[in-house]
Every structure is written in structure tokens, then in C-alpha cells.
Amino acid sequence: MSDLPPLPAEPLPGRYRHYKGNDYRVEGLVRHSETLEVLVLYRALYGDTSALWVRPRAMFMETVVVDGRIQPRFTRVSNE
């Protein structure tokens, strides 16, 4: 698997706030085993914090429209 391109630099590990207000910790980037799509590995910092989740990097990094305003889906708030 040495012929794989390097993973993107962002998002960096740390605390991010979802546009709906909850905080999450990005643990790192991973690849889908079949498609090699880059996914963001993260966990909620509320409720069950032991569960790990993945979301396509493109979706994690995209913008959303809320009340007519364009904003990031996730915003980095700390290195924590």
C-alpha cells in the first residue's frame, strides 16, 4: 500500500464545533477500505463520548446555509 497518496493535512486533530452547537474531537483521518475515500474519525464531546464516528472529509469540510448565511459545517475551536 505504499503507492497511496498521503492523507490531506486538514482537518487537524482537535476540538471542533458543529454549526448546530455541539462540540466534537477530531481524532484523525482514515481511508475507507474499499474506496480509499478519506474520512474524518471523530467523537462527540457530549453524551456517549466512547463512540467513534466517521464522516467523509468533503462533507466535514463543506459549508452549509443556515438562515440564509453560509458557514462551515465544523469550526475548529481548539487543539484540545
Please annotate each region the language model reported:
Residues 1-80:
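Mixed-charge, low-complexity intrinsically disordered regions
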